[in-house]
């Protein structure tokens, strides 16, 4: 069954969890698609994961177009979500539309952009012109130099700001709201408040769905493992088994567990 925006909203309304994994090539796209992962995120995480750079900032539009095309060739049913790259959408809604249109022409079905309520005008501009949007709030990696590192967002008084971001962006027409590294109670409140389905990474188990970087889920990560990561390969013994275990754990609401949550 072809996954669409309507499919995602129906799953969320029925309380059935949505699964998302990053994907950068045709072979893994085919494997994840056949396993039943609903969303393949062609993320700018390809910078650190595939290119070996230390952040997502150097990733270019050309990089994204190449990897989206690769994934689109391998996926038959999954919805392909493409990241908008740093510097290619922040200047104006018009700049964002030109960038997003190229991502869709390459094979994406939806684009993801980072930022809070101030991105509402751009979100609305894209949606009104036929481009589905996933809003990325909380820890937004393209803002790493502003945050001074990769840190949990939304604690204390900052929680109200992130809740407002989610409300404003959903009202602007975002089809999905992705929350990264926010406290689980805040993510739960946002999920219960906004109409758009929510996807969490380091945001507790009460979101509409979950996402992990594929390589993290398979135990392929240099250095220290992030708190929200679980290595599904350890027990599964095969890539296909690990993917199936991830899907089952998300659907059964056993992942993320307490130890993966802020």
Swiss-Prot record:
Tagged with keyword Cytoplasm: yes
Cofactor detail note: Binds 1 Mg(2+) ion per subunit.
Any GO molecular function: 3-methyl-2-oxobutanoate hydroxymethyltransferase activity
Cofactor(s) needed for function: Mg(2+)
Domain of life: Bacteria
One term under GO cellular component: cytoplasm
Pathway: Cofactor biosynthesis; (R)-pantothenate biosynthesis; (R)-pantoate from 3-methyl-2-oxobutanoate: step 1/2
One protein family per Pfam: Pantoate_transf
Binding-site positions, Mg(2+): 44, 83, 114
Compartment(s): Cytoplasm
Catalytic activities: 3-methyl-2-oxobutanoate + (6R)-5,10-methylene-5,6,7,8-tetrahydrofolate + H2O = 2-dehydropantoate + (6S)-5,6,7,8-tetrahydrofolate
Presence of the UniProt keyword Cytoplasm in the record: yes
Residues reported in the UniProt entry to bind 3-methyl-2-oxobutanoate: 44-45, 83, 112
BP terms from Gene Ontology: pantothenate biosynthetic process
Catalytic residues of the enzyme: 180
EC assignment: 2.1.2.11
Keywords: Cytoplasm, Magnesium, Metal-binding, Pantothenate biosynthesis, Transferase
Gene3D superfamilies on file: Phosphoenolpyruvate-binding domains
Top EC class, one word: transferase
SUPFAM superfamilies tied to this protein: Phosphoenolpyruvate/pyruvate domain
Task of the protein: Catalyzes the reversible reaction in which hydroxymethyl group from 5,10-methylenetetrahydrofolate is transferred onto alpha-ketoisovalerate to form ketopantoate.
Similarity-based family: Belongs to the PanB family.
PANTHER family to which the protein is assigned, alphabetical: 3-METHYL-2-OXOBUTANOATE HYDROXYMETHYLTRANSFERASE
Subunit structure: Homodecamer; pentamer of dimers.
NCBIfam families found in the cross-reference section: panB, PRK00311.1
Protein name (Swiss-Prot/TrEMBL): 3-methyl-2-oxobutanoate hydroxymethyltransferase
Gene: panB
């Amino acid at each position: 069954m072809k996954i669409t925006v309507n499919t995602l909203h129906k799953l969320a309304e029925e309380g059935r969890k949505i699964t998302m994994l990053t994907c950068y090539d045709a072979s893994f796209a085919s494997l994840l698609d056949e396993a039943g992962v609903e969303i393949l995120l062609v993320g700018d995480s390809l910078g650190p994961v595939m290119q070996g750079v230390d952040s997502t900032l150097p990733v270019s539009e050309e990089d994204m177009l190449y990897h989206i095309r690769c994934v689109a060739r391998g996926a038959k049913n999954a919805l392909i979500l493409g990241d908008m790259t740093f510097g290619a959408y922040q200047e104006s809604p018009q700049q964002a539309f030109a960038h997003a249109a190229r991502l869709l022409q390459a094979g994406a079905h939806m684009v993801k952009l980072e930022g809070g309520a101030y991105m509402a005008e751009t979100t609305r501009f894209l949606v009104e012109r036929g481009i589905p949007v996933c809003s990325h709030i909380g820890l937004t990696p393209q803002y790493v130099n502003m945050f001074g590192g990769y840190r949990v967002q939304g604690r204390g008084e900052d929680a109200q700001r992130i809740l407002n971001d989610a409300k404003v962006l959903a009202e602007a027409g975002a089809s999905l709201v992705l929350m990264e590294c926010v406290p689980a109670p805040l993510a739960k409140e946002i999920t219960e408040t906004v109409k758009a389905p929510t996807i969490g990474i380091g945001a507790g188990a009460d979101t509409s769905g979950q996402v992990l970087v594929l390589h993290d889920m398979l135990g392929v990560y240099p250095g220290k493992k992030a708190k929200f990561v679980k290595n599904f390969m350890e027990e599964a013994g095969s890539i296909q088994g690990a993917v199936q275990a991830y899907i089952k754990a998300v659907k059964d609401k056993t992942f993320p567990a307490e130890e993966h949550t802020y």
